[in-house]
Amino acid sequence: MLDRSFSAEIQQRIDQKTKPLGALGQLERVAHHLALIQSQNQDQAVTQLAIHQPTVLVFAADHGIAAQGVSIAPSAVTEQMVQNFLAGGAAINCFCRTEHAAMRVIDCGILRAQPAHADLIEQRLGAGTHNLAEQAAMSSEQVQEGIALGKALIHREVESGCNLLMFGEMGIGNTSSAAAILAALSGLPIEVCVGRGTGITDEQYQRKRALVTQGVERCLGAAPQDVLQQVGGFEIVQMVGAFMGAYEKQTPVLVDGFIVTVAAYVATLIEPNVRDFLLFAHCSQETGHRAVLEMLAAEPLLDLGLRLGEGTGAVLALGLVRAAVEFYNHMASFADAGVTV
């Protein structure tokens, strides 16, 4: 649980800056949140915030449901895009360069194992999931292993010096899996949870809704781990574990789009204290994203109409987090500046 003992002291420091109360809006809330996190286990509230080694972890895996035509792209594109990430040619690479963030890809279960690469971490749970519309996507053992792998990954990242994490994902068919998870756990209507992903046709959209409904009917109202077994994805399961690992290491995560937010939601159902370490980057165009953000009482920093994934929204929001850190650290107080109000 996040120790809020220094909350008033932190807020006073923010309020004494040379600005009207609350004038920096959400940036003030970001600074306050980070200050609370970085003041954990301290004798007093931190007066200087720091961001060290901000890192994007892109969790990648394939989905059996993709063979049913629920996406504009075939499953082969998962592997192709992973290679694009590793070659530095994707949107996430461009944004990581502009924001000076590191990026690594985690192979959680792409159809084919990938050649070794310095920025590729192999944590394969299998060669893609089963078709969630017809049978359990994975075994209970794979769920438990995936959560454990995600936790251990974050422990290593934090112990190597990272103190701000961002998660992204890549997996053809994973909006179907995320929508099914959300519908099964929340009870929200299918039409609220299922969106058009990368831009499917009306016919594909109706098929996607029908297939997701079949999966949800097997696990509606079940426990989170059981829902993950029935309709989850290998990358989603590992992200759930990663969010739990971030809580264990008291490290904030800048949460990206729909799929990542659903993983965060699942993690909070398993361990409610996870919520204390989440910052929400943006609201995407995917139908269910706004709904799950509301369930998490989240206030995303951006609303840019994004629907790409990869962690792109999280990295774009990193600049705002840096700005929050800068004003907290260096903006003068009224007393320092000799300003009287």
Swiss-Prot record:
GO biological process: cobalamin biosynthetic process
Pathway(s) where this gene product acts: Nucleoside biosynthesis; alpha-ribazole biosynthesis; alpha-ribazole from 5,6-dimethylbenzimidazole: step 1/2
UniProt family annotation: Belongs to the CobT family.
Species name: Vibrio cholerae serotype O1 (strain ATCC 39315 / El Tor Inaba N16961)
GO MF term list: nicotinate-nucleotide-dimethylbenzimidazole phosphoribosyltransferase activity
The protein's name in its UniProt record: Nicotinate-nucleotide--dimethylbenzimidazole phosphoribosyltransferase
Gene from which the chain derives: cobT
Protein function: Catalyzes the synthesis of alpha-ribazole-5'-phosphate from nicotinate mononucleotide (NAMN) and 5,6-dimethylbenzimidazole (DMB).
Gene3D superfamilies hit by this protein: 1.10.1610.10, 3.40.50.10210
NCBIfam families assigned to the protein according to its UniProt record, in alphabetical order: cobT_DBIPRT, PRK00105.1
UniProt keyword list: Cobalamin biosynthesis, Glycosyltransferase, Transferase
Organism classification: Bacteria, Pseudomonadati, Pseudomonadota, Gammaproteobacteria, Vibrionales
Pfam families: DBI_PRT (PF02277)
HAMAP family the record matches: CobT
Annotated catalytic residues: 310 (proton acceptor)
EC numbers on record: 2.4.2.21
